[in-house]
Amino acid sequence: MAPAAASPPEVIRAAQKDEYYRGGLRSAAGGALHSLAGARKWLEWRKEVELLSDVAYFGLTTLAGYQTLGEEYVSIVRVDPSQTRVPSWLRRGVLVTLHAVLPYLLDKVLLPLEQELQADPDSGRPSQGSLVPGGRGCSGVRRWVRRHTATLTEQQRRALLRAAFVLRQGLACLQQLHVAWFYIHGVFYHLAKRLTGITYLRVRSLPGEDLRARVSYRLLGVVSLLHLVLSVGLRLYGFRQRQRARKEWRLHRGLSHRRGSLEERAVSRNPLCTLCLEERRHPTATPCGHLFCWECITAWCSSKAECPLCREKFPPQKLIYLRHYR
């Protein structure tokens, strides 16, 4: 009896199990870096640590020709488009590159590009979206982006910003569309596997598959498509709102620059953020009373829901943004 194709629940359980172990590896590597180099270096290099963790996980499993922990958990194996052979080393290498490395590279290029295009070209200050010193203009990618966007006109910057936004949001929507399509047809769960033609076969035979599960997944796929349409509309609306708010902010900042030099000197003496060790911008207070940059503390709380100084636990929604605070 020929091996049967893996069912959608098996593929999803394998992916969820892999995500669980990848998350544990990322957390352990990030914790080691934080303990050895401190919070500042952890914030600066956390994306690279996550990339190395993912490459290590898939390099020791997929690239080496073994099952991942998730695939072993549900007893499924990868096969090439012929459905009779294990994928070649080259095909597995392309799979790991598309699944783990390419998203990092796109984020590394598109995010600094959007931040530099959103920044005021007439101002010497770095963009507000940066989080840490390595992201505030010190990285090679940011310097390259800044050098090539410095000569653009305002109209060209707006057009390029729209293109970068459409590309980044379009990739996210494509991923959601692909998952919804999987719920309906149940073949490729990850976009990288579709591009490489890698599918799954069962290693062991199971009792007859419940047809109600198939129907439920198809219904979930339809709901996911409707949710995708709604989220695309909300993202476009939010982008237009941000564009309008950015214009108002630039007008307000242009008026504020006309104030006297005394106030300029007072602003320049703002205290430092203890996370990035730079002038504190958009001050935000934790429930325990410590102050940080809004960008720094929100990035910190995305992985550690505690104060970086006193280690008091608190949920991220308890952060207090201080308006007009000096």
Swiss-Prot record:
It comes from the Eukaryota. Belongs to the pex2/pex10/pex12 family. The keyword Zinc applies. It is found in: Peroxisome membrane. GO terms for molecular function: transferase activity; zinc ion binding. Gene3D superfamilies: Zinc/RING finger domain, C3HC4 (zinc finger) (3.30.40.10). It comes from Macaca fascicularis (Crab-eating macaque). GO terms for cellular component: peroxisomal membrane. A zinc finger (RING-type) spans 273-311. Pathway: Protein modification; protein ubiquitination. Residues 38, 123-147, 237-326 are cytoplasmic. Its EC number is 2.3.2.27. It catalyses: S-ubiquitinyl-[E2 ubiquitin-conjugating enzyme]-L-cysteine + [acceptor protein]-L-lysine = [E2 ubiquitin-conjugating enzyme]-L-cysteine + N(6)-ubiquitinyl-[acceptor protein]-L-lysine. This is Peroxisome biogenesis factor 10. The chain crosses the membrane at residues 8-37, 39-60, 90-122, 148-185, 217-236. InterPro entries: PEX2/10, Pex_N, Znf_RING, Znf_RING/FYVE/PHD, Znf_RING_CS. Residues 1-7, 61-89, 186-216 are peroxisomal matrix. Zn(2+) 1 binds at C273, C276, C293, C296. E3 ubiquitin-protein ligase component of a retrotranslocation channel required for peroxisome organization by mediating export of the PEX5 receptor from peroxisomes to the cytosol, thereby promoting PEX5 recycling. The retrotranslocation channel is composed of PEX2, PEX10 and PEX12; each subunit contributing transmembrane segments that coassemble into an open channel that specifically allows the passage of PEX5 through the peroxisomal membrane. PEX10 also regulates PEX5 recycling by acting as a E3 ubiquitin-protein ligase.
